[in-house]
Amino acid sequence: SFWDFSQTEDFFKLSIPEIIEDVNQNNIDHNFHVETKFINSIVQGEYRFLHDLKFDEMLHARIIRPQSYSHRFISIDESIYKYLKDHNLELFIKNSFVAILGDDEYEVIKSLNRVKNSIKWEQVDKLANDEVFNLIDKNNKDTLVVKRGGEAFHENIPEIKSYKNSNYKTLTSEFNKPYLMHGSIGPSASCSIYKNGKFVIYSHSQAIYALKSILSNAFNLEEENITLHFMPGAGCYGHNGADDVTYEAALLSKEFENKYILLKWTREDENCWEPYGSASKNKLTATLDENNKIIYWSSEAYSDTYLTRPMVGKLEYFVSQRFLNNDFKKYKAEPRTGAHMGIHRNLDPIYNFKETRLVKNLVHDLPLRTSALRTLGAFANTTATETFMDDLCIEANIDPFEFRINHLDDNRAIDLLNDLKTQMKKDKLSENGFRGIAFSRYKNSASYCAVGVELTVSDNVEVELKQAWISVDAGEVAFKEGIEAQVEGGFIQAASWSLYEQVDFDNNEILSKDWDGYKIIEFDNIPLIKTSVINRVGFPYLGVGEAVAGPTGASISNALKRALGERIKSMPFSQENITKQLLG
């Protein structure tokens, strides 16, 4: 390893050539092309993902789950055991945690529902007793003040300011975002063997080293007795089911020693049991003075937590732990106070408003399991901010680019907006098309991103994206093609969130069990995307992948307002939601 080599005599004899030119110069070619690793074998079906692992002495496993988080195992029809024996299958039951295993994966899959139907469960508590946005309003909350710079504080919450000046105009707005899935194209999986007191585990978790410590704690083993390999599976951009399935595979391998256990979640498992991005609500108030400058800005964010990653001493964050221990109580999350943490990420606007009132509300006892999903609270907060900015610019009768620039001191932000404006001017507006723009700087410290969208709305109230323009400033450009791929992929994901995605549930269970129940964007509504990358030579390199999400949601909403003449206040901007609001 590097560390071994660094201790040798040869290491200190290395001759490092003097760098004649600073790396922050124009001698770097930013336009090179990189071939995706293993792309040929992936396309040809030769490449092995974690799901494709094969070992001798291997058992395939599936978890048998109840309807929802609060179901207790009561009994099983004993006649099922003869069926299991005849088909060479094993059943593992510990309290309310149930798994089926066998050396023939197809037999395991075929038998899954048969065994599930033989089990009697008791519902300990309802999943929900009201519509989630009503619960957000009425449930208990931890409420904190957020100050400029993005940190949160346990201080007295100021009242919303009002003005008596008749020349001032005060507007209010509200924005709702539903629960969102990670929506990984493949379900989570893990493979584990426990042999001679040691684990060897394969996982596609984002947090391999942290997970190793957690498993050490969970199984009371020294970390040196756990080998945890990262192996590619479905990407997750946050906390999906990858950690849960790794824990479950390890648990089963400890019960069935000396055998590899390949555990795959089903599509229904992934959709119903992963931690979601929280439903959220934003409430805003702003006042324009006689010169159409914003002199007061109030923004409140309401949401469940964005952090329930398993950690040492917090094994209850594994979804199976509640069933292993028959512990169905809800655990109270603690509010995070660091700059631009979960709920209040990008709540602090980049604009130079004279006075701000920023408040985060961590709402307790909401129905669904939540954790980190790409951008955390920034998607909702940026969408709320930038749609409200558009409402204000319409009220002031000022061009949306000009109105934003009037409230900016940051020259990079101003340059970005002008770059987007230049891009959009080059392309003719399509027939019946409407345009919207939005911009932000992710976390007010990462990349700047501005998005323009053109869309049409059919007589059937179906939204079609026609064109999109992205301007991005990620500091000095090291790999232009990579930046373009990141922001264009992020645009498509955020457009899908904005127009289609929503986790549906009732009092008893999650209803979005498959792709029919959880709609995502399809190829026929992906617009022509044009991307401009501003190269800031000599400036720090900035993270870029998440910067586009909020501006995408807001630009779509802003184009829709121009098309419909009314602000649609709840995502997704689907035919159902638009019609419901317009018809009252």
What do these predicted ranges mean?
Residues 1-584:
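Cofactor-binding beta-sheet edge motifs in enzyme active sites
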